[in-house]
Design a protein with these regions (language model features):
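Phosphate- and other anionic-substrate recognition elements at nucleic-acid/protein interfaces
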Residues: 1-179
Length: 179
């Protein structure tokens, strides 16, 4: 049987907070790292995962949908062939992990670090569902098409503005020539 390690990732514009959970106990002191949300931070994550995950067979990363903020991290995960799942923020907001009384309560305190732990625990409790349908970024063609459609929309708006200006100028010139 594979020994799995579950990583919760709280993504923000500038930083990534990662926490891991092995399904047994939470190591509040050593199971968290905060890095920058860029290539230098991803390199630190790679070193940290290799260090903390040396006794594990598989890794599963989970994070909330945050739009563009997690796109580069997702590209990095896919380049390293890590499996990851995307979680709806509403599900995470309602998720309350079952913890022992002596452990810190995750439902009362709101920090990026605790959010990462909460996501890691969610990842462990839902790993079979996530593994059945892991997340993948769409193909590069999708992003190119999306950019082209946005450009087309912008050009259409600009064209309408120019036509309106031309109409206003023609109407103004006609009004003056009649007088």
């Amino acid at each position: 049987m594979d020994k799995e390690l579950f990583f919760g990732v709280d993504v923000s514009k500038k930083t990534l907070d990662l926490a891991y959970y092995d399904g047994e106990a939470i190591d509040w002191k050593n199971a968290h790292i905060q890095v920058s949300n860029d290539d230098a931070g991803f390199k630190k994550i790679g070193s940290w995962v290799a260090k903390v995950g040396k006794d594990f067979d598989t890794f599963l990363f989970c994070m909330e949908y945050t739009g563009l903020y997690n796109q580069n991290f997702r590209l990095w995960l896919e380049s390293k062939e890590y499996i990851y799942g995307m979680v709806e923020p509403r599900k995470m907001h309602r998720f309350e992990p079952d913890l022992d009384d002596d452990q810190r309560s995750l439902d009362r305190i709101k920090t990026d670090e605790l959010d990462a732990f909460r996501i890691a625990i969610y990842c462990e409790q839902n790993h079979k569902k996530i593994l059945r349908n892991p997340s993948k970024l769409p193909s590069p063609v999708y992003f190119k098409l999306k950019r082209l459609l946005a450009e087309r929309k912008q050009n259409t708006k600009q064209s309408v503005l120019y036509k309106q200006q031309l109409h206003d100028i023609c109407a103004y010139d006609t009004d003056l020539s009649v007088e």
